Structures are given as structure tokens and as C-alpha cells.
Swiss-Prot record:
Gene Ontology CC terms: Cul4-RING E3 ubiquitin ligase complex
WD repeats: 170-210, 216-258, 263-302, 305-345, 353-392, 435-480, 481-520
Biased composition (Polar residues): 1-10, 537-546
Repeat in keyword set: yes
Residues recorded as bearing Phosphoserine in the entry: S73, S75
Record protein name field: DDB1- and CUL4-associated factor 11
Length: 546
């Protein structure tokens, strides 16, 4: 019970068996739909499942009567294991050319973003000023008090989105997680090789200063989080424990927080830490939310929250009183920590509109707005003051139940490309243009300080980082070079830098680089004045071996 300390190395269990398509998946499908939607070598998939122990063949009444049955295994959304078909590489996610912004136009978040980016009250021509035009206005004294306001600075930074690869670190296995600390001084990366790497990001650097071997890891580290004081980090895996470890000091002290689950095979897919560092929140494959109190050194809550795996959890703001959860039932639920009880597990409300399982949730940090990524290949923006009706919840549940494809190794069905809004969908906005395959891909709001949270960015199964304009829904940037899906993305809280963590084993830092120089700015002796001059990246000097 409670926690345990460990200073000795341990590797944990190996790769657990995978499940077949999710519980409750639809079983019927017409031959016409099969031919239209399937682009998979079924023999290859069957051989893979047999090799992995997912299914087995048994003889029926006759010698030629063979039956395929599922091996006893929990359904699990996070396991690709040795499947390297990389079907996502062949999938080109359709981009929504005309996003529906009607709900967003009437919402308060539109005013918030316009205020944070210095566009509130401006005419359209003034909103679309180029950077040189903004500088000219400042020189003429037309800016507030002769200088750019905070909103105008955020608008200026929108002209300098990351567009160039500045640093790469390569691992021997898949990179699963990668996040900046709250102050941006540390970047933490978690890889399938059971190693957590910490990078020093102070003064423009990106230099690895510590590698820590994770304990009690089954298959891979699935999620990581920093403590609010920045002195420790937490990680979860296929294990009954969430571990906490020190960042600084000699040696590594791993403390295991025992969640005491009822399931034999147990995994925590998502973790979050309260603002005071006291409580640790986890979402697990048994459909439950777990709360561990670090002061009492015990699990204090086990809430039956979703009908299937809980893939995402997040606190709404710094008060840590309101929290969000999302699962494979396609429902996002809102909870009040002060009223959560094991004997009466009722959320204060629910948000419905997705047609398949939710893979990640990110809060805007104001206890009002959040975004969710989903296997239905969309991101949705929500306002928790607009809960869904029973009709909407039932429509989402039914849509998720009728899904009869497995996102881990199958192509996206063409019917999932349709721009369809379910009855009772209470979302403010839907973003399309990225792929969600193979794993629980993350999406996040861009930082407040540098961008005014005017962007939403996401990983992609096709190896891209996709950046959306929050208000218009259009894709404004795609960062490409990864050879496999990008599972996690993290934007520096104060600088124009994005780090992508990919299943191709690469960690990549993206930053802004001027693509072209005007001829007047080039030396007269230059042979090719229109050719971009080479630019050295200080961070590349810190490229570290694994």
C-alpha cells in the first residue's frame, strides 16, 4: 500500500499482449464498405495477430472448419508493439477548407483571443497588417504609448512561427512523450527504451544533462508530468504504480505511488498534478479515475468514470478543483474535485460530439475552455458552460460503439472523412487536417506569453506537426521530416520553439529561420544574391549522443 522507495535498477515486464478492436465495436459491415475502406493486407494483419498471441485458430466440427477466436486479453488502445506497417504514412488527412465558425463567432473565447493578440476592435485592414507595416506605425507613434502592447507583440510573433529544424536527438526506440517545464528551463523526453532524458533549455540551449532509467516499466513509459516546484517529475506505464523521481541532486530516488487497482493488467495512460503538488490524478485502462494524496501517502479516490479506457485527464486551472477526463466512449466529462465520491461517481457535466475515442485533453487554463483530440480525426474546442444534452451523449456513445476499425494498424475509413456533426454536438469548433492513428496523439493550446493562445497544434500520424489558427480553423503551418507518427508536441512557454517526439525515434526542435533575404541586404560580391545565406543554429552544437 502507499508508496515505496527504490534506488536499484529494474526493467519491469516486457511487451504486454495487445487486444483486438475495442470493446463494443460494431460487428457488421457490408462487403461494399469493406472494399471501399480497407487498404490493409489482411493476411499480414492476421499473421501479426497470431504471432503476437492476440488470436488463435481452433478446429471446429470438421477438418476444414477452423475458427478464429480472440485470446484472453484486455482491450488496450496504446499498443502498436512490433507493428511497423506505418499505415499512417499512406494516409493524407483531408483538410477542412471551410471550417464552420458560427458557434465560435458568438463565443467569449473569440473576444479573449482578439484581445490577447491586439486585434480587438480593429478593422479588418488593421488586423491584417504585415510586420513591416506594424513597425512603420510604431515609428509614426501610432502604437499605444509609443510601443507595442502585449497583444501586438503576440500578433508580431505570429509572423515568426517555427519553420526550420534546429536540433535533433535520435533514440534507438520510439519517442513517446516530450514536454517543457512550466518555466521553459527543462525539457523532458520519455522513450520506449525505458529512459527518461532531461535537457537544459536555459539561455537558448538544448543540451541533455541527465538520463534516468525508469522503474517498473511495462512496454513503455506512457505519460510524464513535472511537479509544480520543478524539482521532481512523474511517469506512468503498464504498472500498478505512478513513479515520482528527483531531477536534481546525486543519484535517482524513485518513489512508487501505489494505486491498488482491481485489474490484473493495469495501465495509467494519462497523469496530472495539482497546482500545490499534493494530489496526483491518473486515468487508467479500467475506466477509472485515480487520485493519490502525496501527503497521506495513499490512494484516496477510485472513480468509475467512463465505459472504457480513460485516455486523458487534465486540471482546468491552477485551483485544481475542476478537472477533465476523456475516454474511448467518446465523451469528455467535467468533475468537481470537492464533490467527487466513490459511492456516487457523478460528473458535473459532459461534453459530447466526438464520434470515436478521445486521445488527449488540454485545458486553456481558465477553467472554461478545453480542446480534445480524437480517433475520429478531429480536434474539438469546448466551453464547459455548454454541457451536452442526453441526446448528444447518446449520439456520441452510439457513434463510438459502431466503429469497427482499429486505429492502431488499420487505415482510416473513408466514412470518417465526412464532415458530419452529430445531433447534440455542443462543441464550439472542429479542426480537421491531422491524422490520429497508431497511438494516443496529443494536441495543445499555444502559449499565452508569446502567442496569446491564438493557435492549436497537434502531432500527426503522418509524421507532421500541424498548427491551426484557433479562430479560423485553418492550418497555418505544417512541420515535416519525421518518418513515423508524431505522438507528442510541446511549445516553449516563452520562445518560438516547438519540440516534436516521434515514433521514428527522433526528438526534433523546430525554430524560426528567415527563408529569404532581399537582394539589397546582400553583399555586392555575392554570386547568388537570391540564395538564402547559411544560418548556424547555436543549439546544434549541443546535439548529444543517446
Amino acid at each position: 500500500m502507499g508508496s515505496r522507495n527504490s534506488s536499484s535498477a529494474g526493467t519491469g515486464s516486457g511487451d504486454p499482449s495487445e487486444g483486438l478492436p475495442r470493446r463494443g465495436a460494431g460487428l457488421r459491415r457490408s462487403e461494399e464498405e469493406e472494399e471501399e475502406d480497407e487498404d490493409v493486407d489482411l493476411a499480414q494483419v492476421l499473421a501479426y495477430l497470431l504471432r503476437r498471441g492476440q488470436v488463435r485458430l481452433v478446429q471446429g466440427g470438421g477438418a476444414a472448419n477452423l475458427q478464429l477466436i480472440q485470446a484472453l486479453s484486455d482491450s488496450e488502445e496504446e499498443h502498436d508493439s512490433a507493428w511497423d506497417g506505418r499505415l499512417g504514412d499512406r494516409y493524407n488527412p483531408p483538410v477542412d477548407a471551410t471550417p464552420d465558425t458560427r458557434e465560435l463567432e458568438c463565443s467569449e473565447i473569440k473576444t479573449q483571443v482578439e484581445l490577447a493578440t491586439g486585434r480587438l476592435g480593429l478593422r479588418r485592414a488593421a488586423r491584417e497588417l504585415s510586420f513591416p507595416q506594424m513597425l512603420h506605425q510604431r515609428e509614426r507613434g501610432l502604437c499605444h504609448q509609443g510601443s507595442f502592447s502585449l497583444g501586438e507583440r503576440s500578433r508580431v510573433m505570429s509572423h515568426f512561427l517555427p519553420n526550420d529544424l534546429g536540433f535533433t536527438d535520435t533514440y534507438s526506440q520510439k519517442a513517446f512523450c516530450g514536454i517543457y517545464s512550466k518555466d521553459g528551463q527543462i525539457f523532458m523526453s520519455a522513450c520506449q527504451d525505458q529512459t527518461i532524458r532531461l535537457y537544459d533549455c536555459r539561455y537558448g540551449r538544448f543540451r541533455k544533462f541527465k538520463s534516468i532509467k525508469a522503474r517498473d516499466v511495462g512496454w513503455s513509459v506512457l505519460d510524464v508530468a513535472f511537479t509544480p516546484d520543478g524539482n521532481h517529475f512523474l511517469y506512468s506505464s503498464w504498472s500498478d504504480y505512478i513513479h515520482i523521481c528527483n531531477i536534481y541532486g546525486e543519484g535517482d530516488t524513485h518513489t512508487a505511488l501505489d494505486l491498488r487497482p482491481d485489474e490484473r493488467r493495469f495501465a495509467v495512460f494519462s497523469i496530472a498534478v495539482s497546482s500545490d503538488g499534493r494530489e496526483v490524478l491518473g486515468g487508467a485502462n479500467d475506466g477509472c479515475l485515480y487520485v493519490f494524496d502525496r501527503e497521506q501517502n495513499r490512494r484516496t479516490l477510485q472513480i468509475e468514470s467512463h465505459e472504457d479506457d480513460v485516455n486523458a485527464v487534465a486540471f482546468a486551472d491552477v485551483s485544481s478543483q475542476i478537472l477533465f477526463s476523456g475516454g474511448d466512449d467518446a465523451i469528455c466529462k467535467v468533475w468537481d474535485r470537492r464533490t467527487m465520491r466513490e459511492d456516487d461517481p457523478k460528473p458535473v457535466g459532459a461534453l459530447a460530439g466526438h464520434q470515436d475515442g478521445i486521445t488527449f485533453i488540454d485545458s486553456k487554463g481558465d477553467a472554461r475552455y478545453l480542446i480534445s483530440n480524437s480517433k475520429d480525426q478531429t480536434i474539438k474546442l469546448w466551453d464547459i458552460r455548454r454541457f451536452s444534452s442526453r441526446e448528444g451523449m447518446e449520439a456520441s456513445r452510439q457513434a463510438a460503439t459502431q466503429q469497427n476499425w482499429d486505429y492502431r494498424w488499420q487505415q482510416v475509413p473513408k466514412k470518417a472523412w465526412r464532415k458530419l456533426k452529430l445531433p447534440g454536438d455542443s462543441s464550439l469548433m472542429t479542426y480537421r487536417g491531422h491524422g490520429v492513428l497508431h497511438t494516443l496523439i496529443r494536441c495543445r493550446f499555444s502559449p499565452t506569453h508569446s502567442t496569446g493562445q491564438q493557435f492549436i497544434y497537434s502531432g500527426c500520424s503522418t509524421g507532421k506537426v500541424v498548427v491551426y489558427d484557433l479562430l479560423s480553423g485553418h492550418v497555418v503551418k505544417k512541420l515535416t521530416t519525421h518518418k513515423a507518427c508524431v505522438r507528442d508536441v510541446s511549445w516553449h512557454p516563452f520562445e518560438e520553439k516547438i519540440v516534436s517526439s516521434s515514433w521514428d525515434g527522433n526528438l526534433r526542435l523546430w525554430q524560426y529561420r528567415q527563408a529569404e533575404y532581399f537582394q539589397d541586404d546582400m553583399p555586392e560580391s555575392e554570386e547568388h544574391p537570391s540564395t538564402p545565406a547559411p544560418m548556424s543554429h547555436p543549439s546544434t552544437a549541443f546535439s548529444s549522443p543517446q
